[in-house]
């Protein structure tokens, strides 16, 4: 096969979900939890030929007998052995491809430590023998997916949120801000406030149920205090949810109290600024001449920006912080849950990008540090 016919693989490794597929496609083929599970008790199931580890959906479905671990914490890989298992699962079980036959585009968190990028590069070339690879910053890919090269991206996933100002395709590292508050924290917070209502959710398996409640029923209030008053005086905001055992629970103000923590981290006992203030602070760290372009191109990305009402609230809050004459535009594409992956798919299929890949030959000559020279 000649190089032109080989589709590149695009793998977006998130703290919560791994998204993988082929460059040129408009959506990822595989989306599965970034988890590795190991049996809690040895040999419970006699004759099952029990594996020593399970990845993704299989780990999720067998969660009752496993201990689940997330190898990516706050967007950054912390457990490389488990990460390798996730990549192996991605190539061989999900996409069913031979990684030695395809260039691979990986994504990384903004401000990812140098040693981490090198380790990713090394594993791709030495363990999986890929012919070529590239590492791209997640938020930059989201911006590309929205058809822009300048703007500020608020990327909020399961493990971490970042505000990343980008000018003419380049992230501005001095102005990137990280907020360790994301989907997993919101799920934990919802578990806590549902417990106050008398429903008990404690185990990792029950956390998944609460995550589903969060995704299906939560929303962001435009005016939090006003919404609290409405919730107290009527049942119009109440919704019911059926648990796997058939029990039905009712949730009211929890629906918007949970995501409100993104705007008021003090709800979680955190001293950090909310996502609106973090976005504003990021813009203020940029050169005064480009701020106008950032305000007018504020792009939301990641699963934790999927709450209904979030764009209107961001518009209102940033409007209150910015100069009164400033034009502010919040862009919330419907496919933003996967916009990092989509941006990667676009980038890896551009003809102009083909000379950007790090080839196996370049890696063999320079070693893992080549990644800092070719990917920025």
From Swiss-Prot:
**Record-linked InterPro entries:** Actin (IPR004000), Actin/actin-like_CS (IPR020902), Actin_CS (IPR004001), ATPase_NBD (IPR043129)
| Post-translational modification N-acetylaspartate, affected residues | 3
Membrane-spanning residues where? none
Where in or outside the cell?
Cytoplasm, Cytoskeleton
Identify the enzyme class: hydrolase
Q: Which family does it belong to?
A: Belongs to the actin family.
Q: Under which EC number(s) is this enzyme classified?
A: 3.6.4.-
Q: Which residues carry this modification: Methionine sulfoxide?
A: 45, 48
What name appears for this protein in its UniProt entry? Actin, acrosomal process isoform
Q: What UniProt keywords are attached to this protein's entry?
A: Acetylation, ATP-binding, Cytoplasm, Cytoskeleton, Hydrolase, Nucleotide-binding, Oxidation
Q: Can you state which reaction this protein catalyses?
A: ATP + H2O = ADP + phosphate + H(+)
Please give the Gene3D superfamilies that the UniProt record associates with this protein.
3.30.420.40, Actin, Chain A, domain 4
In this entry the propeptide is located at: 1-2
Q: Mainly localized where?
A: cytoplasm
Q: Report the PTM annotation.
A: Oxidation of Met-45 and Met-48 to form methionine sulfoxide promotes actin filament depolymerization. Methionine sulfoxide is produced stereospecifically, but it is not known whether the (S)-S-oxide or the (R)-S-oxide is produced.
Pull one GO CC term from this UniProt entry: cytoskeleton
What sections of the sequence does the record tag as coiled-coil?
none
Return any one Pfam family short name: Actin
Protein purpose: Actins are highly conserved proteins that are involved in various types of cell motility and are ubiquitously expressed in all eukaryotic cells.
Which is an annotated GO molecular function term of this record?
Answer: ATP binding
